[in-house]
A protein has these predicted regions:
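Radical SAM enzyme core and accessory elements
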Residues: 52-133
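C-terminal scaffold of the Radical SAM
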Residues: 1-88
């Protein structure tokens, strides 16, 4: 995120600096989150908490109140892509806290798999990250 009255803000406004797109940002966050998780480093917070003041001071870059959820959703899509064959029908088992991430923001993961002819149902299984049948 790029804020007014900062050095980065001035560079952005003068055209010297251009920020990442939303997709670049969310994919980078997903990669970093995955890297930290694999290293056993707990990521406590990702992004900024929702604030009208921050939004008013923003002149560029990416701000989304659900940045972490989107990053986690990208990682779930990658896991599902790794186990799914085109045209297949699957049941994914997961803890209830993961269901919205598996479906994706606005159904993004469901839509992405649907484009490959993949359909799936989700069943709750306490303590399970993701398991496919």
């Amino acid at each position: 995120m790029i804020l007014k009255n900062t050095e980065l803000g001035r560079l952005h406004e003068s055209g010297v600096y251009d920020s990442f797109t939303f997709e670049q940002t969310t994919r980078l966050c997903a990669r970093l989150l995955d890297m930290f998780n694999k290293a056993g480093v707990a990521v406590i917070r990702m992004g900024l908490h929702a604030s009208r003041d921050v939004e008013q001071e923003m002149v560029g870059g990416v701000y989304h109140p659900a940045l972490r959820e989107i990053a986690e959703s990208i990682l779930y899509l990658e896991k599902m892509n790794a186990v799914c064959e085109d045209g297949g029908k699957y049941v994914f088992y997961t803890d209830k806290r993961n269901i919205s991430k598996i479906i994706g923001q606005g159904g993004a993961n469901r839509n992405a798999l649907s484009q490959r002819g993949i359909s799936f149902k989700i069943k709750e299984e306490k303590g399970t990250d993701l398991r496919a049948e």
